[in-house]
Amino acid sequence: WNPFKELERAGQRVRDAIISAAPAVATVGQAAAIARG
């Protein structure tokens, strides 16, 4: 068992989640800005 390996894998999962979430967050932010005018 290698804690660093586990940590690395967790970090990759977090990074993947952030990368997938970023476009959605940007879209929502843009939609809100447009809605506010």
Swiss-Prot record:
A GO BP entry is:
antibacterial humoral response
Its cellular-component GO annotations read:
extracellular region
Concerning InterPro entries, the annotation shows: Cecropin
Glycine amide modification sites?
Answer: 37
Where found in the cell? Secreted
Name the Pfam families on file: Cecropin
Keywords attached to this Swiss-Prot or TrEMBL record, sorted alphabetically, are: Amidation, Antibiotic, Antimicrobial, Immunity, Innate immunity, Secreted
Q: Which family does it belong to?
A: Belongs to the cecropin family.
Function of the molecule: Cecropins have lytic and antibacterial activity against several Gram-positive and Gram-negative bacteria.
Question: Could you identify this protein by its name?
Answer: Bactericidin B-4
